[in-house]
UniProtKB/Swiss-Prot annotation:
Protein name per its UniProtKB record: Protein FAM163B
Organism of origin: Mus musculus
Pfam family name, one: FAM163
Subcellular location: Membrane
Main localization of the protein described in the UniProt heading: membrane
GO CC terms: membrane
Stored InterPro entries: FAM163, FAM163B
Modified residues (Phosphoserine): 40
Assigned protein family: Belongs to the FAM163 family.
Keywords: Membrane, Phosphoprotein, Transmembrane, Transmembrane helix
Transmembrane segment boundaries: 6-26
Protein encoded by which gene: Fam163b
Membrane protein topology class: Single-pass membrane protein
Length: 167
């Protein structure tokens, strides 16, 4: 390939990449405005802001176990089910505003009642050489490491040189 062919091919490739990036950005912007328009139509129909909460209500009861389904939150599900069929047909990707269909059960341990971020107190202990006891029966088949052999291995690997050649 000549230099001119490489330059032309690179220019075409760069143009295609830029056009792909522009197309993705335009698509994302279209989806953003489409979903934004759906939200503004819902706001005009129902000005009650408590109904438009995208998050389920928080409960302080630790023993409350939430099971599958947003049916536990009727106030939150009414705004999601009132999207017009036209809006759903145009913006199918706007369904990410629906509440999650699963909830996690909180741990029932009463020990961590006052501790936040899910951690209890952790005790650390330093280990000395006397604390570590190795069972002699399990290492019976292994030989002890000879210090002379170890130094000989170090010398053998330190003498190796890397060889470079002209390209």
């Amino acid at each position: 390939m000549t230099a001119g062919t490489v330059v032309i091919t690179g220019g075409i490739l760069a143009t295609v990449i830029l056009l792909c990036i522009i197309a993705v950005l335009c698509y994302c912007r279209l989806q953003y405005y489409c979903c934004k328009k759906d939200e503004s139509e819902e706001d005009e129909e129902e000005p009650d802001f408590a109904v438009h909460s995208h998050l389920p209500p928080l409960h302080s009861n630790r023993n409350l176990v939430l099971t599958n389904g947003p049916a536990l939150y009727p106030a939150a599900t009414t705004s999601f089910s009132q999207k017009s069929p036209q809006a759903r047909a145009l913006c199918r990707s706007c369904s990410h505003y629906e509440p999650p269909t699963f909830f996690l059960q909180e741990p029932e341990d009463e020990d961590f009642e006052g501790v936040r971020n899910g951690g209890g107190r952790v005790a650390y202990k330093s280990i000395s050489q006397e604390d570590v006891e190795l069972p002699s029966a399990s290492f019976g088949g292994l030989q002890a490491l000879n210090p002379n052999r170890l130094s000989a291995m170090r010398e053998a690997f330190s003498r190796s040189r890397s060889v470079s050649t002209d390209v």
